[in-house]
Amino acid sequence: MRSFLKPLLTIAAMALGMTAVIPMPAWALVELNVNKGNVEPLPIAITDFQGGDALGAQISQIVTADLKRSGLFAPIDKSAFIEKISNPDAAPRFDDWKVINAQALVTGSVSKEADGRIRAQYRLWDTFAGQQMSGEQFFANDANQRRVAHIIADAIYERLTGEKGYFDTRVVFIDESGAKNARKKRLAIMDQDGANVRYLSDGRSIVLTPRFSPNRQEITYMSYESGQPRVYLLQIETGQRELVGNFPGMTFAPRFSPDGQKVIMSLLRDDGNSNIFAMDLRSRSTTRLTNSTAIDTSPSYSPDGSKVVFTSDRGGRAQIYVMGADGSGQTRISFGDGVYSTPVWSPRGDLIAFTKQTGGEFQIGVMKTDGSGERILSSGFQQEGPTWAPNGRVLMFFRDSNGGPKLVSVDLTGRNEQPIPTANFASDPAWSPLLE
């Protein structure tokens, strides 16, 4: 078979390459249709990657954990494996894998290059068709070992579902530590699985609602360091920050526009009314988008930037509204019982996630962009703040049920809810786009 090479991405100025070894035959059997509702998880066997001592097993463990956490895959316990893979480049004994109902098989290897880089490669096999589906290799420095595993998991996810994965991403959030009445809150960033936590602020001031820019290099957030809530821009890698305007009153809930050129937020005036404004980050000019005597807040752009979803209590209690990006055509779309908050548009453009408080419960749900088809994915005590994975298939939010908030993810079926491990309490998550 002919193979080809093309660039995949750059990590810390280290170019990684992707080599597709053998294309999937058109008649291969393994596939997951993630658009048909509830999907039975696909049984998949993921062997330890050969070589690299403990690193091969670690990469296998990370790939396994990523795929399992998605809810679409059911990794088979290694104790059930019949064949012990010794040469990951050779075709496996497919019958041995069919016996344990492994519909897909992942083999791989890790080695150290002469220049000190890690070389990791994998092969994905369709055991019932008896064919290789894909195979790729990656090079990285030691600092990016975990990223290589996430990239491999993304490649497998995409090959078997036809959609982009979301494992090579980061989450920015509020790390909370200390006693409840003296809680220290710090900006923090981590991999989507809870690893590689790094703190972006020192905890001397209260910080809230961090949000990623589309280029993944900046975040907006709120800080009370001046005594009043103000919106800041922070460069993640350099730590450089700047104040986004010095508005009278208080500013809340900042988010970037999809092109990264604007920040949309709500401003609370002395009269107690909160309205929505957009600021052009180049000219620093602001445009008022709502002008009501109510509380309008929590704005979020649609993926194409043409519309904005927000909440308003102009009808008596907080409901979800949609308007044009210029403030035109403000239309209520939610009509259910309860109080709605924190709406956020899916990266796919098809759904809006929200928090809903009703009957003493806090619910995380989704609805279509016209308000129809409302579905509740999770219910509990004091949970809120959904954020979308970049492929629009999973949500993350925070739940306060044992003395402090923790992060939780849930897929669109509502059946696959997963805790996200953090060393301390954690709130206000925001999911990054896929890294590059």
UniProtKB/Swiss-Prot annotation:
Keywords: Cell cycle, Cell division, Periplasm, Signal
Subcellular location: Periplasm
Pfam families: PD40 (PF07676), TolB_N (PF04052)
Single GO biological process annotation from the record: protein import
Primary site of residence: periplasm
Membrane-traversing stretches: none
InterPro entries for this protein: 6-blade_b-propeller_TolB-like, PD40, Tol-Pal_TolB, TolB_N
This protein's GO CC annotations: periplasmic space
Keyword Hydrolase: no
Residues in the signal sequence: 1-28
Coiled coil: none
Keyword Nuclease: no
Function: Part of the Tol-Pal system, which plays a role in outer membrane invagination during cell division and is important for maintaining outer membrane integrity.
SUBUNIT field: The Tol-Pal system is composed of five core proteins: the inner membrane proteins TolA, TolQ and TolR, the periplasmic protein TolB and the outer membrane protein Pal. They form a network linking the inner and outer membranes and the peptidoglycan layer.
NCBIfam families: propeller_TolB
Family per similarity comment: Belongs to the TolB family.
Protein's UniProt name: Tol-Pal system protein TolB
Organism encoding this protein: Mesorhizobium japonicum (strain LMG 29417 / CECT 9101 / MAFF 303099)
